Amino acid sequence: MSEALPVHVTVVIPTRNEEAAIVDTIRSVPNDGWCEKLDFLIIDGNSTDRTRELAEEEGASVYLEPRKGYGRAYKTGFAMAPGDVIVTMDADCTYPGEEVPDLVRKLMQED
């Protein structure tokens, strides 16, 4: 493993009824010390399943967004994210989370 990047990374994930995939999505992002701090912020659109509960069990912070919309969820997440770098992901594991460390490293090199 490379030296930890001196950066706080927040992964923002909008959700609505994603209990089937949210755990895999969170776990797909390596949590092996590649950055100084890594956290997950779930912006939930009033799920009626166990999405919020499962995300919290994985250590994610969860915010219930009463206003509807995918874009709204991201706007809320961006405003709330405590990280220096914000990464966005879909809740259904569409994108390979294992690539997040390399993408953030590349971003930091370009800074």
Residue ranges and their predicted role:
Residues 1-111:
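Structured catalytic core of nucleotide-sugar glycosyltransferases
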